[in-house]
């Protein structure tokens, strides 16, 4: 981008935490992004570009806050654990994380429509900054979802608009066939991360089974208690 100074750009990075969830950090200057990456991310990064870090989500947020930045949770609700609203984070931890960041992504072109609706509702409830993104891994995706604001055509001005709640989001999801093709292409290019990703999938599946089983047991206990005390309203 240094060759095209007349094109407004925003330096940013998407990071995968130790838990497997994603976070976006946007910076006001390229030098800030470079320093953040070299000092706080690269030493804890796996060998592949798609590898997760060894840092927890809280540690990443803490490091990002050391710089002038805008911190966003992308696709907070999605199919697996890449969004922060998943079973790897209990309610208390999730609430603390959502309080710590600047905002959430409310429309993601690669996400499923019903999950985007939940993301949009979350954004309204939090009353924080909102963004949208194409999650573009090919030219077809670019521009499917955009974030816009009435501000100067500079990166810092756009970041300020987002942070101050002056940004709007418009767009729609790509079709299912395109989603499948995009996911397949990413897996082929980054096959080296399969072992780590498989491990995360297994751990998350175990977590889902554990939580769902506990919920079912709780519901059965409650049903049994109500049936047992049906004729004893004072008990």
Annotate each predicted stretch with a short phrase:
Residues 19-24, 82-92, 114-117, 139-152:
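Histidine/acidic-residue-rich catalytic or RNA/ligand-binding cores of hydrolases
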Residues 1-105, 201-234:
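Extended substrate/RNA-proximal surfaces in nucleic-acid metabolism proteins
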Residues 87-111, 147-163:
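Structural recognition of alpha->loop->beta junctions
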Residues 55, 113-114:
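Residue-level recognition of alpha-helix initiation/capping sites
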Residues 76-79, 109-111, 137-138:
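Short acidic/polar capping segments at secondary-structure boundaries
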Residues 58-70, 121, 126-129, 134-235:
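C-terminal functional module detector
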Residues 1-3, 118-122:
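Short, aromatic/basic amphipathic alpha-helical patches
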Residues 104-113, 122-123, 141-142:
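Acidic/histidine-rich catalytic cores of soluble enzymes
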